[in-house]
């Protein structure tokens, strides 16, 4: 059985996440997703959803066979335990592939590292874009509400 690992924050699930996981699943037979711990998310704002809730949502997705929380101290511990054949990276993940390959080699992990390409036809395939859209719409609606209230 060929095991694939995919990792990510998966804060607000969107079509880009689903596509990434579908493509990762195609690389093997069994897909394990490592969901980032809040403590380890440093390259973007703190997640909106609690980590266990993010894990449960990811595990409910069709391509995912298993979803686990990452290790707070050593991001490689779950990978050492899983012993994947492939590690799938999203197009926007902040991992240098060569650095990752070297770290895996140092730990005796013989996994292929594959970067999944972005799909260009998705308007809201970014948690940041979704949050921005919500804030913009909420601000507009709040302004409309306040204007109507003043007319009463």
From Swiss-Prot:
InterPro entries attached here? Archaeal_FAD_synthase, Cyt_trans-like, FAD_synth_RibL, Rossmann-like_a/b/a_fold
Cofactor(s) needed: a divalent metal cation
- List the molecular function annotations (GO) for this entry: ATP binding; FMN adenylyltransferase activity
Q: Which domain of life is it from?
A: Archaea
List, alphabetically, the Gene3D superfamilies matched: HUPs
Q: How does it assemble?
A: Homodimer.
Q: What is this protein called?
A: FAD synthase
Species of provenance = Ferroglobus placidus (strain DSM 10642 / AEDII12DO)
């Amino acid at each position: 059985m060929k095991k694939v690992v995919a990792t990510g924050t998966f804060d607000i699930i969107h079509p880009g996440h689903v596509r990434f996981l579908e493509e990762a699943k195609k690389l093997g037979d069994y897909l394990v997703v490592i969901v980032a711990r809040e403590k380890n998310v440093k390259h973007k704002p703190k997640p909106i959803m609690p980590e266990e809730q993010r894990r449960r949502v990811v595990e409910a997705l069709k391509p995912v066979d298993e979803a686990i929380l990452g290790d707070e101290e050593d991001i490689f511990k779950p990978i050492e335990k899983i012993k994947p054949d492939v590690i799938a990276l999203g197009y926007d993940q902040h991992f240098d592939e060569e650095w990752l390959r070297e770290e895996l080699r140092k730990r005796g992990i013989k996994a292929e590292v594959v970067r999944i390409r972005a799909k260009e036809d998705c308007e809201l395939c970014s948690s940041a874009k979704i949050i921005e859209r919500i804030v913009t719409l909420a601000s507009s609606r709040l302004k409309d509400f306040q204007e109507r209230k003043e007319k009463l």
